[in-house]
Each structure stands twice: as structure tokens, then as C-alpha cells.
């Protein structure tokens, strides 16, 4: 089913966005 492929791709994309967001927040909050 294409639905499973779409769901998997969406989850992977969401995880990547969350990772980038967390990394950006850490860099922004860090005193460095």
C-alpha cells in the first residue's frame, strides 16, 4: 500500500524536522 510508504516517509521527515529544531534551540540557548 502506498499509504504505508507515505506514513513512513512522513514519520522520517517529522523526526528530521524535530532533530533540526532541537539542535537549533540548543545552539540558540547555549551561551557559546
Swiss-Prot record:
**What molecular functions are annotated in GO for this chain?**
electron transfer activity
Q: Does the keyword Electron transport apply?
A: yes
Transmembrane segments in this chain: where?
Answer: 9-27
Query: According to Swiss-Prot or TrEMBL, what is its membrane topology?
Result: Single-pass membrane protein
Q: Name one GO cellular component term.
A: plasma membrane-derived thylakoid membrane
Q: Which GO terms describe its biological process?
A: photosynthesis
Indicate the principal place this protein occupies in or around the cell.
membrane
One short Pfam name that applies is PetM
The alphabetical list of record keywords is: Electron transport, Membrane, Photosynthesis, Thylakoid, Transmembrane, Transmembrane helix, Transport
**Compartments, record wording:** Cellular thylakoid membrane
Origin, by domain of life? Bacteria
Its job: Component of the cytochrome b6-f complex, which mediates electron transfer between photosystem II (PSII) and photosystem I (PSI), cyclic electron flow around PSI, and state transitions.
* Subunit composition and interactions: The 4 large subunits of the cytochrome b6-f complex are cytochrome b6, subunit IV (17 kDa polypeptide, PetD), cytochrome f and the Rieske protein, while the 4 small subunits are PetG, PetL, PetM and PetN. The complex functions as a dimer.
Q: What family is reported?
A: Belongs to the PetM family.
Q: What is this protein called?
A: Cytochrome b6-f complex subunit 7
Q: Which organism is it from?
A: Acaryochloris marina (strain MBIC 11017)
Amino acid at each position: 500500500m502506498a499509504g504505508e510508504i507515505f506514513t513512513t516517509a512522513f514519520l522520517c521527515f517529522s523526526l528530521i524536522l524535530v532533530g533540526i529544531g532541537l539542535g537549533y534551540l540548543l545552539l540558540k540557548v547555549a551561551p557559546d
